[in-house]
């Protein structure tokens, strides 16, 4: 079957006023920092629907959107080989994002073992973000083609370990049980992920990773409602038959993926490509996703990013987006 490619164009222009960090306490053994940013963004309608900080958008017009992030981080020296660390970041409530309360992003405590790596416990990115994160550069504008984000861009209940040694970066994570993850009616029993990355002398970065989720089956239709859209496409059905979907509830989910990058984001030219494959138990088809972006950052504070995202399932394009964004971050000096 020949499938047409439906392309949605998302565009946004942003002006970011950022105070990256300020030290508010330091006694040589312990220190506490605060950080944050304020962003104003002009978006077309399609882009506004893809903003990560918008709860919902019901109209069909262009919009001016503001977003505020605030965070706090701390460190205490335990001994010459280890430090205790803590971190928390929130999305602040604003009139334009639909949230009337604080929304937690990353939040964890841990031990920084210096050359032995860092172990953290709490809410954050699992190890597979090493793969998907190379194209997660749009600040607020994200279409999230990869199924890694199906339950949100942050996960709670994570053990996370990171080690950099001998030219390689290793990340390992373990997911503990979470009920009704991201209000999806899906319960996670446990999960794990691992990723390995390296960068060549020419500036090319290569990474490969895999993640696994053990899913808890539910005996009620609420537990299967999350999967009905994919099942309709997979079996070419026209109705949301929850009883049918309930019989095909998956018991596990596996993501595999790779990424290739060139350069460093925010420093001149940056290029990135990643691809992922997702397998749900009891699904006869795999989900495939591809994202690619090109970014250039100028010394005067301007940057421009263009990217393409594709997600396919059962010979159907679930998503096909061309995204363009221009950004300006206020700098101490401005030269054109």
Regions found by a protein language model. Name each.
Residues 40-46, 90-94, 123-127, 165-167, ...:
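Transmembrane beta-strands of outer-membrane beta-barrel pores
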Residues 194-331, 335:
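Detector for outer-membrane/organellar transmembrane beta-barrel domains
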Residues 23-43, 58-177, 188, 197-200:
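Outer membrane beta-barrel
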């Amino acid at each position: 079957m020949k499938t047409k490619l439906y392309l949605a164009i998302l565009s946004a222009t942003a002006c970011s006023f950022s105070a990256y960090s300020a030290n508010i306490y330091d006694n040589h053994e312990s220190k506490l920092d605060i950080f944050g940013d304020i962003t104003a963004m002009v978006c077309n309608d399609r882009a506004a629907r893809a903003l990560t900080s918008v709860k919902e958008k019901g109209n069909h017009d262009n919009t001016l959107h503001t977003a505020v992030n605030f965070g706090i981080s701390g460190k205490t020296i335990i001994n010459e080989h280890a430090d205790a660390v803590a971190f928390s970041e929130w999305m602040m409530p604003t009139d334009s994002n639909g949230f009337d309360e604080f929304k937690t992003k990353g939040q964890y405590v841990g031990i920084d073992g210096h050359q032995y790596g860092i172990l953290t416990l709490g809410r954050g990115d699992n190890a597979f973000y090493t793969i998907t994160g190379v194209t997660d550069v749009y600040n607020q504008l994200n279409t999230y083609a990869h199924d890694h984000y199906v339950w949100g861009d942050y996960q709670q209940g994570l053990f996370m370990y990171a080690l950099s040694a001998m030219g390689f970066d290793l990340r390992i994570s373990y997911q503990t049980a979470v009920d009704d993850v991201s209000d999806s009616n899906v319960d996670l029993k446990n999960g794990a992920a691992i990723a390995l990355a390296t960068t060549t002398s020419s500036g090319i970065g290569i990474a490969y990773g895999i993640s696994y989720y053990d899913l808890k089956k539910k005996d009620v239709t609420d537990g299967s409602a999350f999967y009905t859209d994919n099942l309709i496409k997979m079996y070419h059905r026209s109705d949301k038959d929850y009883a049918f979907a309930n019989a095909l509830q998956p018991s596990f989910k596996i993501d595999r993926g790779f990424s290739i990058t060139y350069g460093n984001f925010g420093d001149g030219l940056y290029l990135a490509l990643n691809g992922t494959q997702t397998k749900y138990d009891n699904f006869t088809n795999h989900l495939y996703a591809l994202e690619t972006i090109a970014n250039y950052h100028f010394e005067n504070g301007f940057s421009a990013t263009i990217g393409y995202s594709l997600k396919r399932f059962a010979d159907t394009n679930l998503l096909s987006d061309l995204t363009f964004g221009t950004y300006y971050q206020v700098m101490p000096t401005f030269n054109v």
